[in-house]
A protein has these predicted regions:
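Conserved beta-strand-loop-beta-strand hairpin that lines the nucleotide-binding pocket
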Residues: 1-8, 53-147
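A short, mixed-charge helix-start or loop-turn motif at secondary-structure junctions
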Residues: 6-10, 32-35
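STAS-typified acidic loop motif
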Residues: 8-19
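Conserved short strand/loop->alpha-helix "switch" segment adjacent to the catalytic nucleotide/phosphoryl-transfer site
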Residues: 22-47, 106
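Conserved polar catalytic motif of the HATPase_c/GHKL fold
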Residues: 48-52
């Protein structure tokens, strides 16, 4: 299916860019007229994915985070967040709740949070090459009231 609209954004993996990425994607998704809950779901999932890039993919270095979002005729949004960082050795294990490579401060809930807020999440990764997180959510069609 061909996207009706799309946008791309590339940002440095700095923690202060996480809020910008979240807001940019949320603003783009408003074209589908989401509920407050739906927009918050998208913002939370994007925040978790971008934070994973900052904390895990590049660790103590600065790299690029590539974000694309697409809107489809069936009111679905597809968001891809990609890095060219260290990659994930075992994606299945990494997606288990409480698994973390980030040390004591990290809760290991990022992927679980993304899964709880989005309809589908797909993670592909190659060690030494990077990771792509694909998030999809169908935004409910709302009946417009006559003015």
């Amino acid at each position: 299916m061909k996207a009706n609209n799309s946008f791309s954004l590339t940002i440095p993996s700095k923690s202060n860019n996480e809020a910008f990425a979240r807001a940019a994607v949320a603003a783009f998704v408003t074209q589908l007229d989401p509920t407050i809950e739906e927009i918050n779901d998208v913002k939370t999932a994007v925040s978790e994915a971008v934070t994973n890039c900052i904390v895990h993919a590049y660790r103590d270095t600065i790299g690029k985070i590539y974000i694309t979002a697409q809107l489809f005729a069936d009111n679905t949004v597809c968001i891809r967040i990609r890095d060219a960082g260290c990659g994930i050795e075992d994606v299945k294990q990494a997606m288990e709740p409480l698994f973390t490579t980030g040390g004591g401060e990290r809760a290991g809930l990022g992927f679980a949070v993304m899964q709880s807020f989005m309809d589908t999440i797909r993670v592909t990764s190659r060690v030494g090459k990077g990771t792509t997180v694909t998030l999809k959510k169908k935004i409910s069609l709302r009946v417009k009231a006559d003015a």
